[in-house]
Each structure stands twice: as structure tokens, then as C-alpha cells.
Amino acid sequence: MNTKILETLEFNKIKDLFQGSLQTEQGKLELQVLQPTTKKEAIERAFLEVTDMEQILVEDPHFHLAATKDITAISKRLELDGDLNIEELLVLKKVLRVSHDLVTFYNDLENVRLQELNRIFENLVDFPAIQGSLLAVNDGGFIESFASEELGRIRRKIQENESKVRDLLQEILKNKGDMLADQVVASRNGRNVLPVKNTYRNRIPGVVHDISASGTTIYIEPRAVVNLNEEISNYKADERYELLRILQELSAMIRPHAAEIANNAWIIGHLDLVMAKLAFMRERGAVVPAISDTQAIQLLQVRHPLIQNAVANDLHFGPDLTEIVITGPNTGGKTIMLKTLGLAQIMAQSGLPILADKGSRVGIFSQIFADIGDEQSIEQSLSTFSSHMTNIVSILEQVDSESLVLLDELGAGTDPQEGAALAIAILEDLRLRQIKTMATTHYPELKAYGIETDWVENASMEFDTDSLRPTYRFMQGVPGRSNAFEIARRLGLSEVIVSHAQEQTNTDSDVNQIIERLEEQTLESRKRLDNIREVEQENLKFNRALKKLYNEFNREKETELNKARLEAQEIVDLALSESESILKNLHAKSSLKPHEIIEAKAQLKKLAPETVDLSKNKVLKQAKKNRAPKVGDDILVTSYGQRGTLVKLLKDGRWEAQVGLIKMTLEEQEFNLLKAEKEQQPKRKQVNVVKRANTAGPRARLDLRGKRYEEAMKELDEFIDQALLNNMAQVDIIHGIGTGVIREGVNKYLRRNKHVKSFGYAPQNAGGSGATIVIFK
């Protein structure tokens, strides 16, 4: 698309309307380079993305994106084998965090059928390992001591020596306070010094770092702390080196994935732009138009997006119409209508929603050309006519049948008779070349051209003769007429003079009377159309009510299906329960190892279909409410599908339960009473429901803090085996930070264990790098 039309129609100002809704720098960059396209598939994809986002926000109104920065320069540095600084790592950390949140959101998204955004979401790549490593850099830009064992050791040494220095200085302050100018420890040149009175400078041996302006105070670093301060300086140099090494290590870890992370950043920005489009639709009442295959345009209640409270108009530019000529006096809104058509096309071809009603349709044009306004060049001393004609000559040389042409005040700026003749000739040339054109003019001769010529239609802007003001309503099919006589009469001009003037233009008066009747018919048609729109709105309300009833019916149907699934599940559960019993007997009577038991269980479970989620079943919920739990009751932990026994009711209302070899603390809603189920179904066997859930629930924990390495590894092996035997989906291992030996041992063990799906550090508020969360397959 030529840039001149974008400037003429102020497309950059249109983009600014979306700017305020954007959260990401990448989204702002994408909007900045956005241009109209002629590829129908690309436009339809852009519109489908907006429709998809609308569905997502209906399902989850709280879905949002966090602000992220552009990582183009960061990616370039990584490609050139450069190392990143802390600020750049924080930018990447934010991008990875948002990427992870989006992946999680998409995986959990239900009840939404996406047509385009699924492709976008599925291209996101999650990097849990890199995210875990970047936890070492906190959001304040500080590299935590657990980033490496060496860094932790260095910082402990610095703290120890600084503590010794403080103790020594405090002792000197206490014992030799009378020799000091002030009872404080000062700092000079990065060293801790004491303000010693000049008269006692030889009584406190050390290094002089500064002298006060008056010469009465000497700032001395006592000899007793010089060596310690030297050690501190050396350790701080080591710290800087280690921090640099950590940054290099993190950069090396990220470098192979730079392209994928950059793609993640683009996706985040793209989703941000899609959300901005949807926000514009909701705030301004915009719509996504249909795309025509025949360049047919139908704009319903279209408005100019840059004009506050713009009058809405209908415009029909069908395939059987080549030109629309808007005639009539100036100041009626003809130019605005011209620009409104151009902007609607440019916005739609850029994948942006347009200010119109549903049912609107746009074409696809390879180029849009316009000659609008007075663009004469003072430097070239061109007249208004010459300026317009220069533009029109250029347009006529470039246009083809795939173009849209907008001409404002065609033929103006010269002799009216010659100007009208030129205007008709130019329009005829465009018509014969089948180039869609909308033109405005105040020459009455063009009314006849519009009436007599095929594929051409007249139009005008409505004028209220009562208020003597333009209404800015577009009247398609009705030529414009002069209201000079009526205006003069209402302003008080003598009736004799007005009548005499009308006698001089009898022919024009007849034409004006015909136009007046056409205007009346158009107004009547508009009223009927308004009534039709009201009926359509009522139908929409009725359709929404029907849809609501349909959804309620589906929910009831799902309830009945769940009951059927429950009965089927009980049969499966019985088989699984019997297999559990067999395996336990084998384990008790033979020398099978725990991991062999786990393998056997896994093979048996493959024989059964996937379990259904009964946690939301109304029948079970009602059964649970029939009796309050008490100590000794058998229970089923819903999140893990494990049987247990209630041991004690705690003060806070939670229950302590024995589940296998593990004790758990449970909320009442986290388990079902098995005895209550027995009372209702005395003839049925009680069974275990084997289920793993991703939702939050009770967890088994192993605390290895304070253990020796060999002892900790043995306990870890036994604990993991027991957790697998008990069908745990997730466990927590607390190893602390310490020297990192136990933590590294845990990581190595988990990496080797084929039953572990994934593991990573806990959130900061749940132990951070001092605890590891393990998720089983």
C-alpha cells in the first residue's frame, strides 16, 4: 500500500487509538510496523484471532498479560556470543515467567474452541530449567548466595571478617573512647576508620586515610583491623569474579535457546496486540467485518474513528456499482464520508476492527489512491487546480481494476463549466476501466451524469432546512440539491426577490423538486430500516435466551452422564482394588523389591481406562454431607485416590490422617468418608479410586535437613519408593540451602529416576531453593 494514502487518512492516529491498551514493548513494535495487506488469508487469520480472544475472555475474564520489554538487542548479543548483565537477565526472566504462565493457562483452558490462537499458544516453549536457574537473580537485581557454592562460601567469609572488624572497632571505642573525636566508626576510601584526636594520633597505631579540614581529627584504620580489611577486599574481588562467572554461566545456558525465547517474546507481544484490538471493539462498539471476494463493500452504521460522536451512516458499494458521486454544497460532511470509506478499508486490510455494525463487509484492494483537501505546494507556486490535477494525473497513471480511488471536489479551482466537463471525463475514464471510485463535487452537471450513466450512483449529505444545519447523514441514491432559496427565505429575504430568482431557474427548480421527493422517500426508508434494526435487536435477545437454555440443558445432560460414568468407574475401581491386594500379598510373602512392585502396578493400571474425576459429583458430595467425620473413620483422599484413617481433629478444624506410612493434614473437603458410602451401599465392596490430579492438595514431605549425605540418600530412595507405592502424584523434599551437597545429591537422584516426570525448586514463599517439588509420571 502506498504510504501517501496512509498519511492522507492519518493512519498513524488510528494506530494511536490502540496504543493505550498495549502492555508490552513487542506489541507496540508490531503495531508500529502494521501495514495494510492484500492477502485475504492473513486478514481472516487476524480477525479469527480477535474472535478467539473474545471467547477466551468470556471463559476467563481475568486473563491478562504482564508488561514485558523488547529483547531484540538481548537476542542479538547472545547470537554474537556476548554475555548478559543482570538487567538483561531480569528482562529475560520476565519473558520466561509470562511464557510459562501462558503455557499453563492454555493447558488448563476448557470449554473454548480456538480456530487460530491455538497455533500461537502451541508455539510457546516453556523453559523450567532456565527459569529455575534464574531464581538466583532476584527481582531487585541481586544475585542470591545460593547461585553457587563458591559465592555462598565467599560471602560467608566476608560476613565473618566484617563481624570481626566491627567487634575490634567496638572494643577500641570502648577502651580508648577519650582519644576519639566522636564515638562512631567512620568510612574512608572504603575502609572502616576511627576519628582520632590529633593529639592522640600516635596512641592508636594504624594507617591514616584522611585528615579533617581543621586538622584536629585524624581518620585512622587501626592496625588490628588492617589485615582483616585486606582479606575483606580480597574476598570482595573474588565475589566480583564469581558473580561475573555466574553471569557467563547463565548466558551460556540461555544462548542455545535464544531464538525460541525471542519467538516467545514475539508471541507475547502478538497476543497483547490481539487483546488491544478486542479492547477497541468493546470500548468503541467496533466489529470484525466480513471479507468480500468481489470488492463489494457494505458498511452498516459506519463511523469515522477519529471524530468524537461521529454520525453513523450506511454505505452500499456492491459489485454492480463502479462509482458513487456525492453532490451538493460544501460543509455537509462529504469529505468525512470519503475518508470514512478509506479508513474502513485500510483498517480492515490491516487486520483491525472497524467502527461499524455487524453485517458489514469490505473488499480487498491492491492500492487505495486519494486526492483529498488542498495540497498545493507554495514552494512550487502551484494553484489549487494545478495541485489537484497533478495528483489526479499521477493516480490515473498508477490505478488498475484492483484499486480504490477517492476524489474530493473533483474539478474544483477553475472555470465551473470546464471544471465540470473535466470531472465527467475523468470519472468516465475510471468507469470504463472498472475502477471503484467515490468522488465529491458541488457541480450540478454531475447529477445528470450520475442519473444517466450505468454503474454510477448519485449520493448526497442531508441538510435540515428547519435548523439550517447539515445533519451529516449520508443519502445514497439521492443527488444533492442547493438549498439557497429556502435558506434565503428563512433568513428573511423578501419573497418577491426569492420568487424572481426561482423564475430564472425554472429547470433547476423542477430538478430540485424531484430531489426533494427522493429525500422524503429516503427518510421514510430510513425510518423503516430503524424499525427493522429494533426487531433484529429483539431477535438477538431471544437468541441469547435460547442459548442460555441450551447451555443449562447441556449441564443437566453432563450430570446424568457423570452418574453413568460413576457406575462404570466403580467396576474399574474394583478391579484395581483387587490388583492392589494381590500386589500387597506378593510384597509381604516374597522378596520382591519396591521398584519391582512399582513396575508391576504400572502394568496392571494400563489394563484399566483413565479414571474420571468424581470430585465434583453431586451424588458423592451429598453422601458426604449425610454424616460428620469422626476419629477412626476410613477416608478417601480425593486428590490422590488413597485410602486412610482419621487420627485426630486439630484445633483449626483440619484433620490429621494416616495414609499408608505417611501422616497428612487435611481439610474436610479434601477427603470423602468411605464408611458413609458403605452405609448407603452395604452390598458393595469398598474400593480404592486411583487418581492423580494437578490441582493443589495435601502433599507428602521428606525433611533431609541435618542429615549426613549417605543417610539422606538412603532415606530419599525409601521415601520415593513408598510414595510411588502409595500412588502419590507429587511430593516435597526439604533439603535446605546449606553447602548444597544434599541438594545436588537430590537433583542427581531425581534425574536418574525414570518414574519422575519433572522436578524444580519450590516458590519463594514455600522454601525457594531450599525445597524441591517432585511430580511423578
UniProtKB/Swiss-Prot annotation:
It holds the Pfam family Smr. Its EC number is 3.1.-.-, 3.6.4.-. Residues 702-777 form the Smr domain. Disulfide bonds: none annotated. The keyword Transferase does not apply. It comes from the Bacteria. GO terms for molecular function: ATP binding; ATP hydrolysis activity; ATP-dependent DNA damage sensor activity; endonuclease activity; mismatched DNA binding; ribosomal large subunit binding; rRNA binding. It is an enzyme of class 3 (hydrolase). ATP binds at G328, P329, N330, T331, G332, G333, K334, T335. PROSITE patterns: DNA_MISMATCH_REPAIR_2, SMR. Keywords: ATP-binding, DNA-binding, Endonuclease, Hydrolase, Nuclease, Nucleotide-binding, RNA-binding, rRNA-binding. GO terms for biological process: mismatch repair; negative regulation of DNA recombination; rescue of stalled ribosome. InterPro entries: DNA_mismatch_repair_MutS_C (IPR000432), DNA_mismatch_repair_MutS_core (IPR007696), DNA_mismatch_repair_MutS_sf (IPR036187), MSSS (IPR046893), MutS (IPR045076), MutS2 (IPR005747), P-loop_NTPase (IPR027417), Smr_dom (IPR002625). Endonuclease that is involved in the suppression of homologous recombination and thus may have a key role in the control of bacterial genetic diversity. Belongs to the DNA mismatch repair MutS family. MutS2 subfamily. Homodimer. Binds to stalled ribosomes, contacting rRNA. This is Endonuclease MutS2. It comes from Streptococcus gordonii (strain Challis / ATCC 35105 / BCRC 15272 / CH1 / DL1 / V288). The lineage of its organism: Bacteria, Bacillati, Bacillota, Bacilli, Lactobacillales. The gene is mutS2.
